[in-house]
Each structure stands twice: as structure tokens, then as C-alpha cells.
Amino acid sequence: WNLREYKKQMKNQEYLKETYEWKDLLAIVHKLRQPDGCPWDSTQTYESMKKCVADEAAEVVEAVDNEDFINLREELGDLMLQVLMYAEIAQERQEFTLDDVIDELAKKLVRRHPNVFGDEEMSRTPGEGLSVWKRVKKEEKTLRKSLPNIAENHIEIPQKIQENG
């Protein structure tokens, strides 16, 4: 990629750099979704992107299977783009942000590795580590299933108090 030659053809040169950082990538994805961005990118939805994310994940697996690590770098970028697009759409809809995704993932990694970040004994084998992950995941899912009932009960209690005055 010859940046100098490419710049001659580009009207919007603020996005052209020799090397990009994370913040640049986020700005590019944001620009693509704007009304003056890309007509295809700006009209994508959660639903319309499902096939894209599945295809990109399959291409990552294929690159690993073929031990094609040059292509793997590109395919990981394509998969990351899908994540960033989903997060950008969510932010537009005021559902969550990329920072929320990062925060939730970091918390999950710490929670599911009490043998690394907590006071549990360190796993000695990969199998033990996976067992810890699965156990904590199961505990989280059980807790999550009980939370809606707790929330519903908390809503009903004030209503019952009002009704019975």
C-alpha cells in the first residue's frame, strides 16, 4: 500500500495514515455508519449482519486449519470489524457501547478465573482450568435465571402495598 499515491486520489485525507491505532479504527467504523458514509455499512442491522459474522468466524477457523497465519491476521481483522459494527449499531440505538462490551468481557474473564485472580487454588492442568470456567459459568447462569423472579417480586411488593394500603 503506497500511502503517497493513494493520498493523491483521496478527497478525505484525514483518515489516511501510515499506521493506525485503536481510536482511528473506531473513528473509521463510526464514519462508515454516518449518512455521508458508506451506503452499505450505514444500512446494516443486527439481523443483516448475522451471515457476515458467521462467514468471518468460519474464515478465521479455515485460516487456522490451513496454518495460514498471514491470512489469519486479515481474517481476525474482518471478525473484529463485525464486533465493532455491532457495537456501533448498539450505540446508535442507545442500547450499549463498545466500552460496555469491553467492561463486561473483562469482568467475565476475572470472574471465571478465580484460580488466577481470586483466592482459589491455581489449576495445574488445562482440564482443571476448563472445569473452573464451566463451574463458574453454570453458577452465573443459575443466578441469572433467578434474577428476573427477584425483580418481578420487587415490582409486585410495592403494588401490593399500594393496593392494600
Language-model regions, residue ranges each:
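Flexible "arm" and connector segments at domain edges
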Residues: L3-Y6, M10-E75, L81-G165
